Amino acid sequence: MSKTVHVIGAGISGLAAAIRLARAGLTVHVHEAMQQAGGRCRSYFDAQTGLVIDNGNHLLLSGNHAACEYARTIGTEAGLVGPERAEFDFIDLPANARWRLKLGGGKLPLWLFDANSRVPDTSIGDYLGLMPLLWAPTTKLIGDTINCSGPLYDRLVAPLLLAALNVDPPEGSAGLAGAVVRETLLAGGKACRPLIARDGLSAVLVEPAVAQLAARGPGVQFGHELRALTPAGDRVGALQFGGEDVVTLGPDDAVVLAVPPRPAASLLPGLKTPQEYRAIVNAHFNYAPPPGMPALTGVIGGVVEWLFAFPNRLSVTISNGDRLVDAPREQLAAEIWGEICKIAGISANLPPWQIVRERRATFAATPAQNALRPGPVTQWRNLYLAGDWTDTGLPATIEGSVRSGNRAADLVLAAGRA
């Protein structure tokens, strides 16, 4: 069993690995280059709106078993809130049409047989047309696998896959899309109940993990950026953090490298990583939602794609947002607010707002970029990779992050037992 494990990076994948290892009884040191944990999944106080906001609006589903188990392990599962049933409200802005997708509460997609539960103007046959995704390889395009037109595609498949893959769906990997469909629509309503970190991502998924790690051992050291790895034969022998700050590894010690692909490639020359990334744009408005407004609304035909109603604010998410990263902020905020007023049925002047543009939010989930994702094992027998950009079998999601951290931790534990 490894005596000590050094986890490099305190994003979700790093925290998941660290929690799993610490609970297994190992001494775990977490080294984070920034002054805050969470990576791209974090909250902070924004002076412009006067609110604590998330850098991105992340949606979990009840079928995200790894993420939900992670929250349960750190004692915050109750902080993931959502409706009792798997129901999603949608609005088609150009058609001025609203509907509610009702996925039921079972393990089978029986909702497909109820016209009142399906997307309007769709038949069971339309959904059967998605079946080729289930056995498609990751090397195949979605656009070459299913029909990318019609009511079902426009009103459900496109928004679902756009949010999951963060690329225009026809150019996305059919295999990754198939994984999403298998774990959501095909898994029945029991797996599709939407869950939101109502009190913020940091409060629910990050800070409790940091506190638990501190209670169990050395915890997280912030502002501690790994500068180089020193090899010793077929293993990593030392970690260099700059100057004389060097950590020498014992013969049974291990390292989990849970950093973004750029620093990972810098630390491991020759490591192949995805090279193309796509932006996600989020906007937050200091305006309490009207009574009875759904916590989540999918939007068709607008700039807004998903509208989140938090107790004290309205927030939107726009995926594959490269086209908006250089748009004038004031103009973009006004355009988004105008759509929010239509969606929420309100009439109000533009409230205090903030635009958050994550330019490299996720790797582009295309066949070519997916092929560049590395597995967790490296050329060094005591060094393992974690991150949503590694080869998890899923797009870049919180669920993928947690699974990758768990996988790296399990490899460390297995090596210790060998």
Curated annotation (Swiss-Prot):
One of its GO terms (molecular function) is oxidoreductase activity. Pathway: Secondary metabolite biosynthesis; hopanoid biosynthesis. InterPro entries: Amino_oxidase, FAD/NAD-bd_sf, SQase_HpnE, Zeta_carotene_desat/Oxidored. Its EC number is 1.17.8.1. The keyword Oxidoreductase applies. The keyword Nuclease does not apply. It is an enzyme of class 1 (oxidoreductase). Keywords: FAD, Flavoprotein, Oxidoreductase. It catalyses: squalene + FAD + H2O + H(+) = hydroxysqualene + FADH2. Pfam families: Amino_oxidase (PF01593). Involved in the biosynthesis of the hopanoid precursor squalene (SQ) from farnesyl diphosphate (FPP). Catalyzes the third (last) step, the reduction of hydroxysqualene (HSQ) to SQ. Belongs to the HpnE family. PANTHER family: BLR3003 PROTEIN, PROTOPORPHYRINOGEN OXIDASE. This is Hydroxysqualene dehydroxylase. It comes from Rhodopseudomonas palustris (strain ATCC BAA-98 / CGA009). The lineage of its organism: Bacteria, Pseudomonadati, Pseudomonadota, Alphaproteobacteria, Hyphomicrobiales.
